[in-house]
Amino acid sequence: MIISTEELTPQEIVERLDKYIIGQNKAKRSMAIAIRNRYRRQKLEEELKEEVIPKNILMIGPTGVGKTEIARRLAKLIKAPFIKIEVTKFTEVGYVGRNVESMVKDLVAESIQLVEEEKHEEVSKQARKQAENRIIDLLLSEKKSSSKGEQETDLRTRRREIKEQLFKGLLEDEYVTVKLEKEPAQDDNLMGEQFEEMGVNFKELFGKILPKESEHKKMTVKEARKVLTRQEADKLINKDQVNQEAIERAENYGIIFLDEFDKIAASSGKQSGGQDVSREGVQRDILPIVEGSTVNTRYGRVKTDHIMFIGAGAFHDSKPADLIPELQGRFPIRVELDSLTKDDFYRILTEPSNALLEQYKALLRTEEVKVNFTEDAIEELANMCEYVNENTEDIGARRLHTILETLLEELSFYAPEMKGQEVEINSNYVKDQLQDIVTEKDSSRFIL
């Protein structure tokens, strides 16, 4: 189920986001308020509820400062369906490229998967029990006695013995033959978007008409348990109920993140002719979806009136005012994200629960190599990251990944031969590995 936003105040949402994302408090606050407003809307009377539309958000800031991560983490927090779409992939209707309605179909597909996983979790105990009964039957058939009389006499005893051994984990490496169903072969070109737009689910239709193919596969009991539990869970859940719940969740809680949003705005002060006409065409195609319309999908009709849209872009060559007025009005909340400083980089390296340094240390620990970063080493890394971003292209926190990969390349290569060793990385080590590359502009441009 969705985490009740009644339990999460805007302040609590920001606090949870702080565990993973450094800084950008204004963006976090705006997102937290938008999520809380969804809860407030659900408490309104039905007539007024339909009138309250979500306030879509426009995030403005360079790459790598946390635009996508804030939205993704928030969606994960409340278990809302979330998709990230690059709007540059869309073209005007009638041209080669993705139709803008495909974003809604992708959101519903994501919602279906989310709800299915939750339903599987709800029936997991029962499904596992039924799967283990099937495994016992398979083990009995694999080891059945050649004597029919003996089989009938000892069947219960042998079944009890196998059950005890199975629960003790003694049969995990035994092999059983499992029947797997395969979907009938279908040509996706014959079942394209034009049929989906009419609300026709050809995959489901052909699945009912054509006989399902099956194959028998030999696998260990451990592998079979996963496969059979999934099969049993599928039998226990109601697909129609899943579809209905998923559509409702997509409609009321779905988040569509429109990346590269600045790329469909006309360039400020530049005359690019036909290109600007094409960009405006994409904006006008997106507009009805953002304003609220009904899209036919293979799972049913989906209303977009209360889906939250987040437009995000750097807006270097254009500005929000270059979007068509109607679309500007649909993104009333504007949030500017700050470029990251050396202090931000230092905090990113050390504070989050999934901090980068902890990730690299954990990876090398699998080779039994213990790595320690001194305080001055972390400060030096933060300084270098800021310097390279200022002197080449500002890619925000993504720069840390390239710098750390370069720093630890030699250590990662020789780690299997260094079992049991402890390595201390200090500022001198950082300078030895990176100083020449950082100060040489051509090298830093291509390597970092």
Curated annotation (Swiss-Prot):
Q: Tell where it localizes.
A: Cytoplasm
Q: What is its main location?
A: cytoplasm
Q: Does the keyword Transcription regulation apply?
A: no
One GO BP annotation is: protein unfolding
Q: Which GO terms describe its molecular function?
A: ATP binding; ATP hydrolysis activity; peptidase activity; proteasome-activating activity
A Gene Ontology cellular component where this protein is annotated is: HslUV protease complex
Which residues hold ATP? I22, G64, V65, G66, K67, T68, E69, D259, E326, R398
Keywords assigned: ATP-binding, Chaperone, Cytoplasm, Nucleotide-binding, Stress response
Instruction: Name the family the entry cites.
Output: Belongs to the ClpX chaperone family. HslU subfamily.
Write down the NCBIfam families for this protein, in alphabetical order: hslU, PRK05201.1
Q: How does it assemble?
A: A double ring-shaped homohexamer of HslV is capped on each side by a ring-shaped HslU homohexamer. The assembly of the HslU/HslV complex is dependent on binding of ATP.
Which HAMAP family does its entry note? HslU
Protein name stated in the entry: ATP-dependent protease ATPase subunit HslU
Organism in which the protein naturally occurs: Natranaerobius thermophilus (strain ATCC BAA-1301 / DSM 18059 / JW/NM-WN-LF)
